[in-house]
UniProtKB/Swiss-Prot annotation:
Name of the protein described by the UniProt record: Histone acetyltransferase ESA1
Classification via Gene3D superfamilies: 2.30.30.140, 3.40.630.30, N-acetyl transferase-like, Winged helix-like DNA-binding domain superfamily/Winged helix DNA-binding domain
Gene: ESA1
Catalytic activity: L-lysyl-[histone] + acetyl-CoA = N(6)-acetyl-L-lysyl-[histone] + CoA + H(+); L-lysyl-[protein] + acetyl-CoA = N(6)-acetyl-L-lysyl-[protein] + CoA + H(+); 2-hydroxyisobutanoyl-CoA + L-lysyl-[protein] = N(6)-(2-hydroxyisobutanoyl)-L-lysyl-[protein] + CoA + H(+); (2E)-butenoyl-CoA + L-lysyl-[protein] = N(6)-(2E)-butenoyl-L-lysyl-[protein] + CoA + H(+)
Family, similarity comment: Belongs to the MYST (SAS/MOZ) family.
Biased composition, class Pro residues, residue ranges: 72-83
């Protein structure tokens, strides 16, 4: 590759000989900063906490002009260095083999142009070779021009046929569009395997109503290359390698059928956020949140209004959770806001920790704002606005100024699968203090009062799985050590409210299942006992059931008829 004529994604493969494969890696110094486009992988300078810096390989996900400074931002100091012209364009990078939480916007001056750069792999040509289209004998007369574009009538037939095929849930007979939402729920619940199909907006709306994501959720787990959400394929994502419908020359005369590229773009810009994990939601739109006295860096995309996108800091009232673009507006709001605790019933108070029960139907605005905040830290959360079917249990810590939110978990009012947690989160400024375990323990205390076995909504994310495994292990091992007689799996489940599947999962993960005298037994190894002793030796908070003042809420059929 000649330094005088750098390769660009548009110019690759357009050499003197047609069909010549373009190099996938550009050597250092053979390209310029203008050649860095979304999709390439390049080395980026990453500052470290110790004051040093290292070069990390990163993928460019998006670019944008450098945002203008906010009118509320403080002026730069007089001795500040002059801005680098390369920083006029910012690049959103994902560090390869690092967690998605570390994705960030960087200026052009942090790109290492002296090292090699990898071009994005071409996807169109290999797929055309791997999936040749079946030739169909055409009954229409051939045209003199020899153009491959079919007539409008044939195009309409082909487009409508492709759209009907895309709406089928199984290879059998076609399913009406009104039943697609129901079929998607059955497929996700595991009743029968579901084939790939293109999702319509009706599907995504039905999926949003039934999917409140776990804090821990994996999909998901759900893990992509860095432990986060991947594209939905078996659940109904659009496979761009299959059935492409060409657009006619006269769009006005065409039926309301889109090509794959148009459909993906439509979903990306106006469709349900459930389908856009790999598009818009890959790019974080907020940098920091100011919640009370804590300034927190966001981890993931959250669908706040576009007017607030890419602000340096979004200011949030820690009591009513309303959001403002400047500290001045927040101060004006705080002078009028009278809320000092979550707007619900306090059902637990002990040692400064309180739990409030909030009905999503009665406090829609507050719960929606809570979901928007939690989406900044939960990559797999897909439900933001339909909060009516859920109860929210918010944990707070009390001081002289009020009850400050620490974390929460949501719970379906009526769960067919028996889940006792739909989404769970401890705010980052309060993590690693044992509050996550308190949330998990409190959810099981509610299940004990209900007299039911409970389990978090599956699948769990990496952090959620670690937290639940630690809780399950502690409770199961503690019960086995305190028992002076043989105890069955059913007795463990009834005393802890942990489901049989979660008990078996924990025992298998700890290698506690042994085969002895023609039966399976639970055997506590020395390593498990030693780890349990170390855990119990640490001082930690615990839920005291005597301070729980709560009865399971009962809802009428009319109260559970959400959206009808």
């Amino acid at each position: 590759m000649s330094p005088s004529a750098p390769s660009t994604p548009h110019g690759r493969g357009s050499g003197s000989e047609p069909g010549t494969p373009a190099p996938s890696v550009a050597a250092g110094g053979s390209y310029t900063i203008d050649d860095v486009v979304p999709g390439v992988k390049i080395y980026v300078i990453k500052p470290l906490s110790n004051g040093q810096a290292e070069q990390r390989r990163a993928e460019i996900l998006s670019t944008r002009p450098k945002p203008k400074p906010s009118a509320f931002a403080p002026p730069p100091p007089p001795n500040a260095p002059s801005p680098d012209p390369r920083d006029d364009t910012e690049y959103y990078v994902h560090y390869v083999e690092f967690n998605k939480r570390l994705d960030e916007w960087v200026g052009g001056s942090r790109l290492v142009l002296s090292k090699e750069m990898e071009w994005p792999k071409s996807k169109d040509e290999p797929k055309k070779k791997d999936r040749p289209a079946k030739a169909q004998p055409s009954k229409a007369p051939s045209r003199a021009t020899g153009s491959p574009i079919p007539s409008d009538s044939l195009l309409k037939k082909a487009a409508n046929k492709a759209a009907m095929a895309a709406g089928k849930a199984t290879p059998g007979k076609a399913m009406p569009s009104s039943k697609l939402g129901k079929a998607s729920k059955i497929g996700k619940a595991g009743k029968f395997p579901q084939k790939r199909k293109a999702k319509t907006e009706a599907d995504t709306e039905a999926e949003e109503e039934s999917n409140e994501d776990n804090d821990a959720l994996g999909e998901e787990e759900d893990m992509d290359e860095d432990g986060d959400v991947t594209l939905i394929t078996s659940d109904g994502a659009i496979d761009p390698s299959r059935e492409v419908v060409a657009a006619p020359s006269n769009p006005r005369a065409a039926p309301q059928v889109f090509s794959k590229k148009q459909e993906i773009e439509k979903l990306r810009t106006s469709g349900s956020m459930t389908q856009s994990h790999s598009e818009i939601s890959r790019v974080k739109n907020l940098n920091k949140l100011q919640i009370g006295k804590h300034e927190v860096e966001t981890w993931y995309f959250s669908p706040y209004p576009i007017e607030y996108a890419h602000l340096p800091v979004l200011y949030i009232c820690e009591f009513c959770l309303l959001y403002y673009p400047s500290a001045t507006q927040l101060r004006r709001h705080r002078a009028k806001c009278t809320l000092l605790h979550p707007p619900g019933n306090e059902i637990y108070r002990h040692e400064g920790i309180s739990f409030f029960e909030i009905d999503g139907r009665k406090q829609r605005t507050w719960c929606r704002n809570l979901c928007l905040i939690s989406k900044c830290f939960l990559d797999h959360k897909t439900l933001y606005y339909d909060v009516d079917p859920f109860l929210y249990y918010c944990m707070t810590v009390k001081d002289d100024y009020g009850c400050h939110l620490i974390g929460y978990f949501s719970k379906e009012k009526e769960s067919a699968e028996g889940y006792n947690v739909a989404c769970i989160l401890t705010l980052p400024q309060h993590q690693r203090k044992g509050y996550g375990r308190l949330l998990i323990e409190f959810s099981y205390e509610l299940s004990k009062v209900e007299g039911k076995l409970g389990s978090p909504e599956k699948p769990l994310s990496d952090l959620g799985l670690l937290g639940y495994r630690a809780y399950w292990q502690e409770k199961i091992v503690e019960l086995l050590l305190d028992s002076d007689y043989e105890i069955s799996l059913d007795e463990i489940a009834q005393k802890t409210s942990i489901t049989h599947g979660d008990i078996m999962h924990t025992c298998q993960a700890l290698q506690m299942i042994k085969y002895y005298k023609n039966s399976h037994i639970i055997h506590l190894t020395d390593a498990v006992i030693e780890q349990h002793k170390k855990t119990k030796a640490k001082p930690r908070r615990a839920i005291n059931p005597a301070y729980l003042k709560w009865k399971p809420p009962v809802f009428s059929r009319a109260q559970l008829a959400f959206g009808f």
